[in-house]
Amino acid sequence: MKLNLSKMLTLLALTLSLIAVPVWAISKDEAKAKGLIGEQSNGYLGIVTASPNADLKTLVNTINNKRKAAYVKSASKAGVERNVFEARMGQRLQDKTPAGQYIKLPNGKWKKK
């Protein structure tokens, strides 16, 4: 059975659309701008919205895992405990957060900067 070019292209487009789904997921900057996520004082991202979808959870977990690996390495180089380094980075990240985006206060509440 021969597939004509049109059917092959349709099949290819369908396959690529299934593979490319993560490309359409929201970015960190978009999620911050929309008020879905924000910076916490511990150096990690947190989810602001009460009902996050799976893509948002995956985004935050992926970024936080990368941050943790970087913090472990940097804390070791600096000769400090990881939690000390995390707190320093958390403060820097919150300080750099633009107006209109969220930061988590020490009392656990989210505040729009």
Model-flagged regions — what are they?
Residues N4, P22-D29:
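N-terminal leader/targeting segments
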Residues T10-T15, S27:
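General structural signal for secondary-structure boundaries
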Residues I26-T62, A78, R82-K113:
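Amphipathic, charged alpha-helical segments and their helix-to-coil junctions
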Residues K2-L12:
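Bacterial N-terminal signal peptides that target proteins for export
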Residues V60-A75:
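Short, well-ordered alpha-helical segments
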Residues T15, A20-P22:
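N-terminal signal peptide c-region/cleavage motif recognized by signal peptidases
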